[in-house]
């Protein structure tokens, strides 16, 4: 089953992720537990029909680029273009939609994006680029927001996503790239988000940044030119 209108990179990402997820070995046991080697999460015998994988599709959605697995391994959260999804993956190889919440860029931001000569067909949208587990009840998400990065907390209820409140959306500069094609990285450690991305509209100011948590915001100084202008995260 083919995904509708998905770019090759996004299509391949989901396929590779599910394939690797089912074959990924569990962590080695702690010392003193017999010294057994890594054990596979799932075992299949040759010829077993359950080895086949199904591909998820949802009409009107594309660019399933950002993935987050829940702690219990039963839910896969997916950041797409202008939406965040929760997929049930309890049945190996058969992802099913649990629920989905829209998070589009505002019409004002889309208009500003197009005015700055960006494409209103391929670029002026909110591409979800950061999706991390903040605590047991919230995810933290950031997106390009039509070349005006934004972030928000997403509340969870029984692993389902609750709607995003407009007044809870924050500036995401330094956490998400402006341009969806720019490389980026983000990891949450002890309640603090460490991110690396481009910090301006032109994509010429790379930055490393620490946000969230109780510590003050910390970031690299662009004037020191410690990072090369073409840095890739």
Segments the model singles out, each with a brief description of its role:
Residues 2, 6-7, 11-233:
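Disulfide-stabilized extracellular ectodomains of secreted/luminal proteins, especially beta-rich
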